[in-house]
Amino acid sequence: MIDIFARQSRPFTDYVIAEPEAVYAARRCDCLSSHALIEFRRNPLLFRKKQLGLIEEEERAAFIVGRAAHCRVLEGEAEFRRRFAIGGPINPKTGKSFGQDTKAYAEWAAAIGKPAISQDTADLCDRLTRAVREHDVATSLIAEGQGEGVVRAEFAGLPSQIRIDWTHPERGIVDLKTIDDLDYFELQARSFGYTHQLAFYRAVLAQVTGRKPEVHVIAVEKKEPYRVGVWRFSEQVLDAAARENLAAIERLKVCRAQDCWPTGYEQIRSFDYLA
C-alpha cells in the first residue's frame, strides 16, 4: 500500500523516458500504439498489412512539417536546428528552391541524412512558437516538464507504447495540434480520433503511475493570425473513448487468434438518410 501511495505521489515526468524517434518507431512491430489502434478500429485489414510490412507508410512533406513544428514549439530552437536541415536545392530555371514534394528536393534531403524543411517552413515554425508562447494558458502548460516522453507498459494484456508531445509533472498530458482554422478544432478532433488517441495515452500513463493524468490539447493555426486555443478533455469523454479502445483491443485479440482481418464492409449496408 505504501508503494502505491509513493508511486501516485511522484511527478508524471518520473515515468517518461527520452528516446530517439527512430527507436520508438522500431518498436511499433511489437508494441501497440494509439495510432495503430485507431487504424485497427477503422480498417483491421489495412492495420494487418501495415504490421506485416506489406504497405509502406507514406512520408509526406506535411508529416515532416508537423514534426518540425512540434520540435520547434516544444523542444526549442537548438534542438530544432539539430534535427532538421533548413533550405533546399535551387531550381536553376526559377532561382528558387525546389518544392518539398519534388524528386530533386527528396534527393537533396536524402544526401543530408536528416529530415529537410524549406526556409518558409522554418519561418512558419518560428511564428507558431511565438503564438503559443504569447498564450498565457498554453505557456503555463509547457513551462515545465518533458517533451516527446515515451512510456511503455502492458495494457489490456498487450505490450503498448505512447509518445507524449509534452508531459507536465503534475497535470500530465499536453498534446500539440496544428490546424488550418481553430473554429473547426472540435470537428477535426472527431474526424481524426483525437479523443481515442488521448484516452489511450491516459490509460497507458495511468498504468505505470497509478493515477489518471489531466489531458490538455494546445491547438495553433498555421496561418494568420495564428490563433491559439487550449482544450481540456473531460473525464467523461475520455472514459467513454477508453471503453471503446478496450473493446477494440478485445477485437484485435480475436483477429490475431483467428488470423481473420476484415475490412468492416463485408455485409450490405443501409443508406437511409439525406445529407
What spans do the regions from the language model cover?
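Metal-dependent nuclease catalytic cores that hydrolyze phosphodiester bonds in DNA/RNA
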Residues: M1-Q161, T263-D272
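Hydrophobic/aromatic-lined pockets within catalytic cores
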Residues: V73-L74, A78, T178-D181, A206-T209, ...
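Short histidine-centered catalytic/ligand-binding loop motif
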Residues: L54-E58, A110-I117, D183-G193, S234-Q236
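Secondary-structure boundary elements
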Residues: V137-A143, H168-I173, A206-P213
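Conserved catalytic cores of phosphodiester-cleaving nucleases, focusing on short active-site segments
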Residues: G147, I162-L187, Y201
